[in-house]
A protein has these predicted regions:
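Intracellular helix-loop hinge segments at the cytoplasmic ends of transmembrane helices
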Residues: 25, 130-136
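Extracytoplasmic gate region of multi-pass secondary transporters
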Residues: 1-73, 160
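C-terminal transmembrane helical hairpin of 12-TM major facilitator-type secondary transporters
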Residues: 15-18, 53-132
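Signature of the 12-TM Major Facilitator Superfamily
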Residues: 3, 53, 57, 84-91, ...
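A membrane-interface helix-boundary motif in multi-pass transporters
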Residues: 165-178
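Multi-pass alpha-helical transporter architecture, strongest
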Residues: 176-197
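A late C-terminal transmembrane helix in Major Facilitator Superfamily
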Residues: 136-168
Length: 197
């Protein structure tokens, strides 16, 4: 398979898994300003537990949308086309990552909604890729082509969390840049003549 299929898969997964790796700490940072109870603020143990609960809640709810996104985006791609849906996912994710990085979506509850959307795109990309491979290379080649895509997926599983951990302050901007690269490739992608097995 070509870079035009493996790179978009890589950037989508890098952004998604990178976010997942830092989702709880980010949510806890956004929840902290909402705590006004003196009993919590003056008790480090209770405060830690409350923040952990807030982080866990975002992780749990967004995980549900990760699963739902696999159904939702795959269904939309059947109607509007794989390329259009991938372009939509890349563009909207890039915008949201930038807004979060700029602090515009720093409210805990707004961030929860954003996280749910971002993880729905992560799951949606995973679910839509097999159909994308079949559409462009033919059903007889889906195993080989999707194997390359999954290799890219595995590499991204290492790359994304490492980038988010090492460049924490800039990680959201880096994710947005990666997604913009994916968007450009998606826009330039031209469907190949389908092969038969």
């Amino acid at each position: 398979t070509s870079w035009s299929t493996t790179v978009p898969a890589t950037v989508n997964v890098s952004a998604g898994l990178g976010l997942i790796s830092q989702l709880s700490p980010l949510a806890q940072d956004y929840y902290r300003p909402l705590i006004t109870d003196p009993n919590l603020l003056n008790n480090a143990e209770l405060l830690t537990k409350k923040l952990a609960w807030a982080g866990g809640l975002v992780v749990a709810i967004s995980a549900i949308f990760n699963g739902l996104g696999r159904l939702f985006w795959a269904r939309l791609s059947d109607t509007f086309g794989r390329k259009a849906i991938f372009g939509t996912m890349f563009a909207t994710q890039a915008v949201i990552y930038i807004l979060v990085a700029m602090g515009i979506l720093s409210n805990y509850w707004v961030f929860m909604v954003a996280a749910c959307y971002l993880l729905s795109c992560y799951g949606g990309g995973f679910a839509t890729m097999p159909a994308f491979a079949a559409d462009n290379f033919g059903p007889g080649y889906i195993g080989k082509v999707y194997g390359f895509m999954l290799t890219a997926w595995a590499c991204a599983g290492i790359l994304g969390p490492l980038v988010f951990a090492k460049f924490k302050a800039q990680s959201l901007y880096i994710a947005a840049i990666l997604l913009i690269i994916g968007l450009v490739i998606d826009l330039l992608f031209k469907r190949r003549e389908r092969k038969t097995a």
